[in-house]
Amino acid sequence: MQLRTGAASVVRTGLGLTQSRCAVQSLTAVPLERRIRQSKAFYHNTKKNDSAWAAAVSVAGNIVNNAVTKAIKGTDGLPTIDPLRLVAGEMKFLTGNIRKLLGSGHPSLDRAAKYYTQAEGKHVRPLIVLLMSRATALCPKAPQRQQSTLQASAAIDTSISPLNILSDFNPSDATPVSIPADTDILPSQRRLAEITELIHTASLLHDDVIDHSESRRGAPSANLEFGNKMAVLAGDFLLGRASVALARLRHAEVVELLATVIANLVEGEFMQLKNTARDEKNPKWSEETLTYYLQKTYLKTASLISKSCRASALLGGADAATVDAAYLYGKNLGLAFQLVDDMLDYTRSEKELGKPAGADLELGLATAPLLFAWKTMPELGPLVGRKFEKEGDAARARELVLQSNGIEQTRALAQDYAEKAIEAISGFPDSEAKDGLIEMAVKTLKRNK
């Protein structure tokens, strides 16, 4: 199978991700480890030369050699792969299945809970889960995981407790879902994709209340349509139904992973309440500021993608190396995705985004473009400290960011994380699904909303 320019070029030998490594083409670009030598900078404070900031500066200096950049250019004229086409059969049933999982005997709750499923969302997270499920189907299996894999797929619509207990005084319950035939994606992996979207949608409902959002996906936000109380309760209901579906997978490690995601979302939201670890009134720029931001970004965005990818490989019975590689792909892709999202807040209009543009500054949030700009523009410090509350603060901060190289630095760091995502799955056997995962990393950098 022929890959697009840049896709094959990031695949390298000697990384030790799996034992079933195909013959691959070596990188002609500057080796990744020479540009960014650590992948855990956002978990711990690090030495100056091994920090997230040092990595970002190094990445920006070598961006012309970046393999993902070459993939985006597509100089060989090959058509790009459409990841959605590869799992179209499963995605076709996604929204309908989710709505079946959300049935409630309370009409108002039913409408609020299903509100965001009516709009046409990107469904990026379930798409990634399904692609990962198909890509890891060809990878080595762990014999000790086969029994739990069979259990997880055998009874995803079967309750563990008696139904009369679960549905007492509630005339409506989750109903069996539609399953496409003749596919190498297991029923448990399809259900995982639906659970992932449920958790993500619940986080949108809660975030829109916290952020006082007025629009979502080009329509009035749920909090505007139903009020804050109903929106919060609807989000809680989605998490409840996701938890039930998760329990019925009957796979303890997967339950632990996705339950941790829900906790991570809350932890990340608490971290976002302040822009720096010390929350000073007149903070000074430091490398730890970017570390704090990346940790928050992992918790709020990358945790769901990374742990869902890992869970997908576990449900397929993959060996430990494949499971770890799936996690690394999701972690790095999730970080790249959010970095691009934060960049678009400065470069796109509300009409293009389908949600308010410039919202981060209005909410008092200092994201990557501003943090990079702050390094050379210390006058941003007092604005960050008071969370852009004074009249004109947000406009001034935006002006300074656009005058700096903050957006370019953010783009460079996002490209590096995308390359690391591609590198993580380089040991997977060649397949259309693997190519689709590579294309998802490329599309993450090219998206404009």
UniProtKB/Swiss-Prot annotation:
SUPFAM superfamilies: Terpenoid synthases (SSF48576). An all-trans-polyprenyl diphosphate binds at R216, K300, T301, Q338, K355. Isopentenyl diphosphate binds at K122, R125, H200, R217. Pathway: Cofactor biosynthesis; ubiquinone biosynthesis. Binds 2 Mg(2+) ions per subunit. PANTHER family: ALL TRANS-POLYPRENYL-DIPHOSPHATE SYNTHASE PDSS1, GERANYLGERANYL PYROPHOSPHATE SYNTHASE. Its main location: mitochondrion. Belongs to the FPP/GGPP synthase family. It holds the Pfam family polyprenyl_synt. Assembly of polyisoprenoid side chains. The polyprenyl synthase of coenzyme Q biosynthesis catalyzes the formation from isopentenyl diphosphate of all trans-polyprenyl pyrophosphates generally ranging in length of between 6 and 10 isoprene units depending on the species. PROSITE patterns: POLYPRENYL_SYNTHASE_1 (PS00723), POLYPRENYL_SYNTHASE_2 (PS00444). Mg(2+) 1 binds at D207, D211. It is found in: Mitochondrion. Transmembrane segments: none annotated. It is an enzyme of class 2 (transferase). GO terms for biological process: alcohol biosynthetic process; isoprenoid biosynthetic process; mycotoxin biosynthetic process; ubiquinone biosynthetic process. GO terms for cellular component: mitochondrion; polyprenyl diphosphate synthase complex. Its cofactor is Mg(2+). GO terms for molecular function: metal ion binding; prenyltransferase activity. It comes from Neurospora crassa (strain ATCC 24698 / 74-OR23-1A / CBS 708.71 / DSM 1257 / FGSC 987). Its EC number is 2.5.1.-. This is Probable hexaprenyl pyrophosphate synthase, mitochondrial. Mg(2+) 2 binds at D207, D211. Keywords: Isoprene biosynthesis, Magnesium, Metal-binding, Mitochondrion, Transferase, Transit peptide.
